[in-house]
Structures are given as C-alpha cells and as structure tokens.
Amino acid sequence: MTDQNPFAASDRDRRAIWEILVRRDSDFFLSGNWSLVEGDYLDEGFLGIDAGGNSDASRWTIGFPTLAAYRQAALDSRLNQADFAEDLRTAWFRCQSLQKIDIGGDIGLAHKRIEGAIRRTTGPALELSWRSLFFMRRVQAGWKICGFVGYLPL
C-alpha cells in the first residue's frame, strides 16, 4: 500500500476511517507526536486486546485497559529512522493494508494488516506479520477508535 487513500471521495465513511487508521496512525507512530491522533480516540470505555499472535481467543489478554496505557505502549515501541536502510515512512506504508471496513449504522469494523519486512542498516530485516481489528464509532465529531484487537496472526 502507498500513502494514497484507496477509497473514493464518494465513500466518505471508509475514506475517513482509512485516514485515521493508516495515514494519521502512521504519522503518529513514526514521529511519536501523539497530538496527531489524540482526537481520533474515544477515551471513555477504550479497550485494547492483545492477541499475542494467537488465534485462540482464550489466550488473549487485556493489553491496553485504558487509552493512556495504549498511548504509552505505542510511544515506547516507536521505530527510529537511523536503524533502517530505507525510508521508514515509505516502508511502513508498503507493509500495511486496510481494504475491508464494515459499517453498520454508527459502528465500524476495520481490518488492518501489517505484513512485510523493512531493511535495517545492520542485521536482519524487521519482519512484520500481524493483523488488527479496530472498532470504530461515529459520533458528532466524526469517526473515533473505541477499541481494537491487535497482534492477531495473519
């Protein structure tokens, strides 16, 4: 995938969700600037489930019981451009896709895949291989992330 939104301008809901989950999320993850995505989340009731690469739901855990916990974990896992032998933003976009977004009324379910490799300056490439399901809610201000199940196996 590139940084070009694949959804038509006429598909406003999916286009907006893609902007939240791909463009802004990537820009935040690569910069560490939380203010880029701060308004994209519903704080009250937020929940992030960590599947830990396991398809057996009985082994999933409450990885991020609050938005603050998720924010800190995301900041702690930020990648550093100096560690990579290719442009990190281009590579990150190449390794992700978000082509399926189900919408029912004011609820959305987005299926995001992270899959590929990013060359490091030394050592083996960073291998990426997981998918996440994002739960979205439409409120007066637009679409917001209210939770997710992350690190699911492909």
Positions of PLM-derived features:
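Hydrophobic/aromatic beta-strand elements that line small-molecule binding cavities or substrate pockets
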Residues: 95-101, 114-116, 131-137, 150
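Short beta-strand edge/turn micro-motifs at domain boundaries
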Residues: 109, 121-154
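Short, low-complexity N-terminal intrinsically disordered segments enriched in polar/charged residues
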Residues: 1-47, 54-55
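A broad structural signal for short, well-ordered beta-strand segments within beta-sheet-rich domains
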Residues: 13-18, 90-92, 145
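Charge-dense, low-complexity intrinsically disordered segments
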Residues: 8-12, 61, 123
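Short, well-ordered beta-strand segments in beta-rich or mixed alpha/beta enzyme
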Residues: 47-51, 108-118
